[in-house]
A protein has these predicted regions:
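Cys/His-rich metal-coordination motifs, chiefly Zn-binding "fingers/knuckles"
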Residues: 1-72
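N-terminal juxtamembrane cytosolic/stromal segments of multi-pass membrane proteins
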Residues: 38-42, 51-95, 253-272, 304-307
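Alpha-helical transmembrane segments and their helix-start/interface "positive-inside/aromatic belt" motifs
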Residues: 79-106, 185-199, 265-284, 380-392
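Transmembrane alpha-helical segments in integral membrane proteins
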Residues: 84-97, 152-184, 241-261, 355-380, ...
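Long, glycine/tryptophan/cysteine-rich extracytoplasmic
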Residues: 86-166, 211-233, 291-359, 402-431
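Transmembrane alpha-helical segments of multi-pass membrane transport proteins and ion-pumping complexes
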Residues: 102-106, 110, 114, 169-173, ...
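Alpha-helical transmembrane segments of multi-pass integral membrane proteins
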Residues: 181-260, 296-306, 377-450
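Hydrophobic multi-pass inner-membrane translocation pores used for secretion
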Residues: 315-319, 327-330, 343-381, 387-390, ...
């Protein structure tokens, strides 16, 4: 029988030591947030049934331990979430983000004065702030003259630019880091923060939309024409988009690494956001390169007259969203072109750009396949459950993208033309869910093959 020496014994003991004998730090890191001490019974000892104080750890009669270590669980019921939302902190974050955006709107108004001159005085700072958040501008005009009295014309301008939406997101990030980041202690708290900030931000924008409606009279006099204008941003449009902006921004930036490890839903949500952003960014870069090498796709959609005074990068950033939507097999309207997989070769687009669109479809399939492989690496089992959750989040995010990228200029009978660039929200939700589920599920299963 071999007897261990003293050195061997110490080396053997060090392998199973929990704490360092030099400075006392723990060798094995345990995630204590996964566990919590809970009372076995609120008042009575489980052993002798003696009534104890709520603060007691041991039974006063028999000494039985009244607490037990159990896995931490969260109550994500709607009533529990809504009843514990901190309205004060939510208002701080949403209000300060609005103040930052108001200052940015003042700067933008000064920049617009260079190109628009005195006409910029008709645009209030609040209007700019609401338009940055994707608000719809409605204009009602009444034309009066000696020969023509009381003719009403209605204009609707719905222009949501992704390039401008970056500004409120940045303001939300800054405000959140100042007022709320330190209080983000667990997944349930994060969901409450996101809902609270989203709702308060939407309400603030709604109030601004209701108080910022303007009226304007132009011209008039004997034998001359006069126009009266009533214009303002639709409160319903900024309410919906404000809630979505606040909720999604806080939920994404507040998701920590440990939340991704502990909560499958938050982990998949963050992966979906990264997947959509990656696809959009690649399409944007490729469209920019295509523009500089001479592809005339911007003019093939019949919108060149409407965008002649807009920076080309802003236009491409908008087109990239529609092309990414088409790459996910969604029907898309861009100017005079209605794009869908079945009619792509019957459109008037050049053959080069048609082939590019087919390549974008292949790109989206590749990205979703890789996402399926990543899901398999993180969650080895429950293929259908994880891919269903992924596809649900993916469809919702694509639907949100459709909401924030809608462009609809309705000139009415006075101007006589309309400009539309959008994705159908309903079709986008349905098709994106089915398409992403099929491709992601294939990627999940492919990773199981040896």
């Amino acid at each position: 029988m071999q007897v261990r020496g003293s050195d061997d014994t110490l080396e053997f003991a060090d392998k199973f030591r929990n704490y360092s004998k030099e400075d006392g730090h723990a060798y094995k890191k345990m995630n204590n947030k996964k566990f919590v001490l809970r009372r076995k019974s609120k008042l009575y000892c489980p052993n002798c049934k003696t009534k104890n104080n709520l603060n007691s750890i041991y039974c006063k009669e028999c000494g039985t331990l009244l607490e037990d270590i159990s896995k931490r669980t969260y109550d994500f019921s709607i009533s529990n979430i809504l009843s514990n939302i901190s309205l004060k902190d939510s208002f701080k974050v949403a209000g300060f983000a609005t103040l930052i955006l108001f200052a940015i709107s003042i700067v933008l108004k000064l920049i617009l004065r260079v190109s628009l001159g005195n006409y910029v005085s008709y645009i209030s700072t609040f209007d700019l702030l609401l338009l940055i958040n994707g608000g719809n501008l409605n204009i009602l005009t009444n034309a009066n003259s000696m020969m023509n009295y009381g003719n009403y014309y209605n204009f609707a301008f719905q222009i949501c630019s992704l390039a401008l939406l970056v500004l409120p997101v940045i303001c939300m990030v800054v405000s959140y880091n100042i007022f709320m980041k330190q209080k983000n202690t667990d997944e349930l708290t994060l969901v409450r923060q996101a809902i609270g900030v989203g709702v308060i931000y939407g309400i603030i924008l709604t109030v601004l939309a209701l108080v910022s409606r303007n009226s304007l009279s132009i011209g008039g006099g004997y034998l001359s024409s006069g126009y009266s204008l009533v214009y303002g941003v639709s409160f319903l449009s900024v309410l919906v988009r404000g809630i979505l902006l606040g909720f999604l921004s806080i939920l994404y930036i507040g998701t920590k690494k440990e939340y991704i490890q502990n909560n499958m839903y938050l982990g998949i949500f963050k992966q979906v956001v990264n997947t959509v952003f990656l696809g959009y960014f690649i399409v944007f870069v490729l469209l920019v390169l295509g523009y500089f090498i001479g592809l005339s796709y911007v003019y093939e959609f019949g919108i060149s007259g409407s965008i002649s005074n807009i920076n080309i990068f802003v236009v491409i950033s908008q087109l990239a969203a529609y092309i990414w939507g088409f790459a996910n097999l969604n029907p898309v309207t861009i100017g005079n072109q209605n794009l869908f997989l079945t009619n792509i070769f019957s459109t008037s687009l050049s053959i080069d750009f048609k082939l590019c669109l087919i390549a974008f479809i292949a790109l989206s399939a590749l990205i979703l396949l890789i996402s399926g492989i990543k899901l398999n690496n993180k969650y080895k089992t429950h293929a259908k459950k994880t891919t269903l959750i992924f596809s649900g989040f993916y469809a919702i995010l694509m639907g949100v993208l459709a909401v924030f990228t809608c462009v609809n200029v309705n000139g009415g009978s006075l101007l006589g033309y309309n400009v539309q660039m959008n994705m159908s929200i309903i079709f986008t939700l349905i098709i994106s869910f089915i398409y992403s589920f099929i491709v992601t599920f294939i990627g999940f299963k492919l990773n199981n093959w040896d």
